[in-house]
Amino acid sequence: DVEPLLGFLSPKSGQENEVDDFPYKGQGELXXGIVEQCCHKPCNIFDLQNYCN
């Protein structure tokens, strides 16, 4: 259950509020790591879980 974790997330961390940094799909996906994805901009719990699996 992710409900208790929602308090730790930024208000902009939901998928509906995401803004793509790269206008062309796939442009930024080649060298994206956890730092680029979750430190330089907010990420959601699902993005974090992808790095733990």
Curated annotation (Swiss-Prot):
PROSITE patterns: INSULIN. One of its GO terms (cellular component) is extracellular space. The keyword Amino-acid biosynthesis does not apply. Residues 1-30 form a propeptide. Disulfide bonds join 38-43. Its main location: secreted. Keywords: Carbohydrate metabolism, Disulfide bond, Glucose metabolism, Hormone, Secreted. The keyword Disulfide bond applies. One of its GO terms (molecular function) is hormone activity. Pfam families: Insulin (PF00049). It is found in: Secreted. GO terms for biological process: glucose metabolic process. Heterodimer of a B chain and an A chain linked by two disulfide bonds. Insulin decreases blood glucose concentration. It increases cell permeability to monosaccharides, amino acids and fatty acids. It accelerates glycolysis, the pentose phosphate cycle, and glycogen synthesis in liver. Belongs to the insulin family. This is Insulin. It comes from Anguilla anguilla.
